[in-house]
Curated annotation (Swiss-Prot):
This is CCA-adding enzyme. PANTHER family: CCA TRNA NUCLEOTIDYLTRANSFERASE 1, MITOCHONDRIAL. ATP binds at residues 28, 31, 112, 155, 158, 161, 164. CTP binds at residues 28, 31, 112, 155, 158, 161, 164. InterPro entries: Bact_CCA-adding_enz_type3_sf, CCA-adding_enz_C, CCA-adding_enz_firmicutes, NT_sf, PolA_pol_head_dom, PolyA_RNA-bd. Pfam families: PolyA_pol, PolyA_pol_RNAbd, tRNA_NucTran2_2.
Amino acid sequence: MNKDLFLQAAPILQEIQDNGYEAYYVGGAVRDYLMDRPIHDIDITTSASPDEIEGIFTNTIPIGKEHGTINVVYNHENYEVTTFRAEGEYEDHRRPSEVIFVRDLYKDVERRDFTINAIAMDNQFNIKDYFNGYSDIQNKLIKTVGNPYERFNEDALRILRGLRFKSQLRFEIDSDTYKAMQEKIADTEYLSIERIIIELRKLLEGTDASIVYPLLNELQFFKYVPFFKSFNTSAIEIKDPIKLELLIAIMSFKQSSNISLSMLKISNDSKKKIQKYITLFNKLPDIKTKKALKVFVYDYGISTLSYILDMKDTLAANQIELGHPLIFNIESIDEINQNLIIRQRSDMMVNGKDILESLNQKGGPWLKDVLRNIECAIINQEIPNQKSEIINWVKTHVEI
């Protein structure tokens, strides 16, 4: 078990304890430590109030002070230190109406979502496990802390989180917990699309995404998300962990949907990736020669095409053709990528101005086509990437 990150944070716990308060590691980091999984972020919980934490440490940032969280900067690292808290009634199935600071660890962990996330650990690596979370880890079981209906009623996102943990950890979901998921799934319509997307990404990229995706359909989750309700999501099959952008591209391509991606509130980069995948799907059947593949590698890049090949089972399951395997394969793509003469239009030794001057013409839509033809000719080594050679080629091949 890797203790390094905990040992780095141990002086913070010790300092809090030296000032007369309790302090523990808590949450996903403890769970992953007990499972011997990689640990990324350390969360600390304490009986000290936010004001008391600010009094103990000199370098702090009040990132969420009203909710009990102070960022403590120690050895150039940031650690979130959160006061033990209980929560009032939840509003809209997503946020508590009030946060109440308490001095009792039990009160703090009993508000958490799943038993596997409700384990606290001190700086001597002794655990406080009020809800048998460690036993559930050993039994590979996802189970809510207390009544599952209450937990999901408090925050419907916990339903998605439970499914995400099943996908990532390859655990089973406790039968009572799953029954409550079925009965409370409609409450996910109250969630913001931003929160849904964060969990959905992690779920789809989890090891058992191919098992959990059908559960989303079984629970009828997608009908409560406006963007997805117009798709027949149960007609889509997943064979491997998948990026959200590729899944949406497959849905859109297979079902010819023109639904606006703006409903998802994802980044422009993500939207471009989705459109790129859809365009790629339309062109894949045309990749029948090495010449066509060269231009394809230039247009889409080794990273995108390697990923598409990795996802060939999922694409095939959704009747998306990949092109002939003797042409479209990783060895051919690698070889072409290593030997590309140019990698982007700016690598060409001519530009639009050069073409206009050489032909004594004014600009127009034709120029874009000419530049594209030059690109393809250079890529396929029909002409060298030299200005004089390109100009001569244009004069003999271009009709305006």
